[in-house]
């Protein structure tokens, strides 16, 4: 329904260039036969001239049209080439036996497109550093995005729905995990990141017996100059915005 409405609006706006004011209302009415849920108000902000007004006071649910505002703002503020980064790092050296005695840290900063394949690349990076054993925990920073994790105005019955995802500074594999042959949506994206990263560590022969811990990574640890660090970058913002709007992806 949303995509159909957007196509109709696009057709109407394109037609504005050639339609006279007197015939425009007839044009809108013809489209209203396809869907009655049309409300249009177009105003020239420079002259305050109302260009089009059709059922302007009809209350409408903006729905996915809001994505246009948020994505346009992000492009304006960050630029189309901006990329979200995720940092995975160790704070100390790996000894000659391949043993690392500390924690491994994941600092996630808003990438909605992270995948298990990129986590595998990170694990391969640490394997090349001769990492064989991690004696500490997986620490995942859970403070980059503010609370709440779930919109307080959303119904509890919506939880677990793909169109009402939890708000998190990371999404790995679209926040999906497999259980009994079925893909399910997690209600704890950061913890799922830890679970998937732990699985990849072990499947690549790296011994890990610690826990997955969600907490703030102190700034002093993020700034340690000699840490071993791997950086994962998202596709460019312009590519992410395409997914948001073209596919109407609520997760992104």
In which residue ranges do the predicted regions lie?
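Sec-dependent signal peptide recognition
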Residues: 3-11
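Short active-site loop at a secondary-structure junction
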Residues: 53-73, 77
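Beta-lactamase-like hydrolase cores
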Residues: 19-59, 124-130
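Acidic active-site catalytic centers that drive phospho-/nucleotidyl reactions
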Residues: 44, 67, 141
């Amino acid at each position: 329904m949303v995509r159909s409405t957007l196509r109709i609006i696009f057709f109407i706006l394109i037609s504005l260039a050639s339609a006279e004011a007197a015939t425009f209302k007839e044009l809108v009415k013809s489209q209203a036969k396809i869907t009655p849920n049309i409300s249009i108000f177009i105003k020239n902000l420079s002259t305050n001239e109302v260009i089009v007004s059709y059922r302007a006071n009809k209350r409408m649910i903006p729905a996915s049209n809001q994505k246009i505002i948020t994505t346009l703002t992000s492009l304006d503020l960050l630029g189309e080439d901006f990329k979200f980064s995720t940092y995975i790092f160790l704070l100390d050296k790996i000894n000659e036996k391949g043993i690392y005695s500390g924690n491994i840290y994941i600092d996630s900063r808003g990438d909605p497109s992270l995948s298990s394949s990129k986590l595998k690349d990170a694990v391969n990076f640490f394997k090349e550093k001769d990492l064989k054993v991690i004696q500490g925990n997986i620490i995942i920073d859970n403070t980059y995005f503010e609370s709440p994790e779930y919109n307080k105005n959303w119904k509890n019955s919506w939880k677990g729905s793909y169109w009402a995802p939890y708000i998190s500074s990371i999404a790995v594999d679209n926040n999906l995990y497999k259980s009994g042959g079925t893909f399910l949506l997690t209600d704890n994206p950061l913890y799922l990141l830890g679970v998937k990263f732990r699985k990849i560590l072990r499947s690549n022969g790296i011994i890990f017996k610690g826990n997955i811990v969600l907490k703030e990574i102190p700034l002093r640890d993020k700034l340690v100059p000699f840490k071993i660090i791997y950086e994962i970058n998202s596709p460019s913002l312009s590519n992410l915005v395409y997914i948001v709007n073209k596919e109407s992806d609520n997760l992104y």
